[in-house]
UniProtKB/Swiss-Prot annotation:
Protein's name according to its UniProt entry: Superoxide dismutase [Mn], mitochondrial
Organism (species): Dictyostelium discoideum (Social amoeba)
Cellular compartments annotated: Mitochondrion matrix
Keyword Transit peptide among record annotations: yes
Domain of life: Eukaryota
Family: Belongs to the iron/manganese superoxide dismutase family.
The protein's role, per its UniProt record: Destroys superoxide anion radicals which are normally produced within the cells and which are toxic to biological systems.
Length: 226
């Protein structure tokens, strides 16, 4: 039986193309970026993108594989105490893998429609619930910037109540642990912005909207609504 933390990560992982969650193989790999490391400059520098993707995300993948290998051994040995002890590592590193895999696709270079406002059902939902895209951005920016320590700001979909939600998560906790479908995430761990923005997180959050891939967010929304 899968621990609760792995079940939650498996669910959101499968919804984002990470099909080997819960398979017999525990070998997860770093996804390719859909653009070059320098494509998001000057909002995010090539140096940050390279470190963030090749070092930080890769570390989450490596540590997730290690934790799942240990879980497999503990399960075979029927070592329930060890299985329970591994849940925090699986949640943290699995969450880091899932969160970043979404994050990369949530962004796009300006010459590939990065920052272009959404249209269609997502735009209608935003206007109905928040009044305008500008008001959504203002609210989500304020809540994301105010996160204490490390974490993520999310725009999600609440299937039970058919509504959008703005939710912050600490550390690498995936949005799925709050019961929502992730649509758009903003990483506010310092490794995501410090080399470019130093300690001025607000400037990073303000500028990242210039490269949000609203087409990707809209596709996630349409899929979640089905």
């Amino acid at each position: 039986m899968l621990p609760r933390s792995l079940k939650l990560i498996k669910k959101v992982g499968e919804s984002n193309g990470l099909r080997n969650f819960g398979s017999q193989s525990n070998s997860y790999t770093l996804p390719d970026l859909p653009y070059d490391y320098g494509a998001l400059s000057p909002v995010i520098s090539p140096e940050i993108m390279t470190l963030h993707h090749k070092k930080h995300h890769q570390t989450y993948v490596n540590n997730l594989n290690i934790a799942l290998d240990k879980l497999s051994s503990a399960s075979s040995a029927k070592d329930v105490a060890q299985m329970i002890a591994l849940q925090s590592a699986i949640k943290f590193n699995g969450g880091g893998h899932v969160n970043h895999s979404i994050f990369w696709t949530n962004l796009a270079p300006k010459n590939q429609d990065g920052g272009v406002a959404p249209s269609g059902p997502l735009a209608d939902a935003i206007n109905k619930q928040y009044g305008s895209i500008e008001k959504l951005i203002e609210k989500m920016s304020a809540e994301t910037t105010a996160i204490q320590g490390s974490g993520w700001g999310w725009l999600g979909y609440d299937k039970a109540n058919d509504r959008l939600v703005i939710q912050t998560q600490q550390n690498q906790d995936p949005l799925s642990v709050s019961g929502y479908v992730p649509l758009l995430g903003i990483d506010v761990w310092e490794h995501a912005y410090y080399l470019d923005y130093k300690n001025v997180r607000a400037d990073y959050v303000k500028n990242i909207w210039q490269i949000v891939n609203w087409k990707n967010v809209a596709e996630r929304y349409n899929t979640a609504k089905k």
